[in-house]
């Protein structure tokens, strides 16, 4: 594996771990003070949206699993690894781009969510 692919894989791993953390915040800790503060909502808003957040959290977990499995396959030389990792980080970046353009008040979160997947995409394609 080339140095660029290795650094891209590391960025993909970090993006995957970030999405595992997002899963935790959305699916497990949604009504906690930390989650309410992070997502800028009241406890009542969190309680009213916990089913939606639970579902969205699992979406983020599946993106993380897809990406992390892809990187594992890459490191073991399986040809399916790189495309799987690329598709995972492409999905992560696409979601971040959608958030960036559809919700101007959430652009900071979109940049945080999309930077590592974008770095991984660029380096994995080189």
Where do the model's predicted regions map?
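N-terminal signal-anchor transmembrane alpha helix
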Residues: 7-28
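Small-residue-rich segments of transmembrane alpha-helices in multi-pass membrane proteins
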Residues: 114-126
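Core segments of transmembrane alpha-helices
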Residues: 57-69, 113-117
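Cytosolic, membrane-interface loops and tails of multi-pass inner-membrane proteins
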Residues: 27-49
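Transmembrane helix-loop-helix
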Residues: 69-115
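Physicochemical signature of membrane-embedded alpha-helices that form the seven-helix bundle of GPCRs
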Residues: 7, 11-14, 59-62, 84-87, ...
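Interfacial helix-start motif at the membrane-water boundary
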Residues: 45-62
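Helix-coil boundary and interhelical linker segments in multi-pass alpha-helical membrane proteins
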Residues: 1-10, 69-83, 123-126
